[in-house]
Amino acid sequence: MEESCLIEVQNLSLCIGDRWLVRDLSFSANQGEFIALVGSSGSGKTTLLRALSGDTPLANGQVITHADCPLPVGMIHQDLQLAEGSTAIKNALSGCLYRHSSLKTFFGFPEEEKKRAVALLQKLGLGQKLNQWTSTLSRGERQRLAIARTLLGQPSILLADEPVASLDGKWAGETLNTLKEYAKDQQACVICSLHDLDQVDQFADTIIQVDPLNHDKWEVKCNPSTKA
């Protein structure tokens, strides 16, 4: 195991009923690494991410994390899970709760946290929406807000389920670049499912792809485009 390793997956297998989704998958993710999960709809990408987060039981194998922080694993879900009756800035700041006591946040978040939240929301194109109710935001804006909230929690292992599925080309690229920068700057790792192969080629350091002829087998390979 490398010293920079944040998560190890050893001989992981997953099944739903009598259908195997994954068999004997092994890989590791290191600090600064961006990993893309690639496969057709229904191939098991979401289930695999939920298994890595601990939300789905394994049929076999193990997942070992080496992160030492208040929020070792953060997950960006497709259903977003935002607080509808709150503003964009308050939703984003809720991601910081893992790093502060409830007593401290009862009196308001520290000023540096507010500045970080505002800067990140501006970067993701939400600078003019800070005090807007979440329920009034578009699907793409809500998706970027959910990403900002998770990043503000500063997880060492960031799992993202189709994080740019609702975004147009410009914001998809900007958002994936933000995730990649986060991995480098915070010495974290990002593992996300993507369906656009151009995005995979541009951003992923490592690609984990389902075998189209043998759907429970997954291939792990380096991306020469980003490793060069």
Where are these regions (language model features)?
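Helix-to-loop junction immediately C-terminal to a conserved catalytic motif
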Residues: 53
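Catalytic Walker B motif of ABC-type/P-loop ATPase nucleotide-binding domains
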Residues: 158-161
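Conserved ABC ATPase signature
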Residues: 133-137, 141
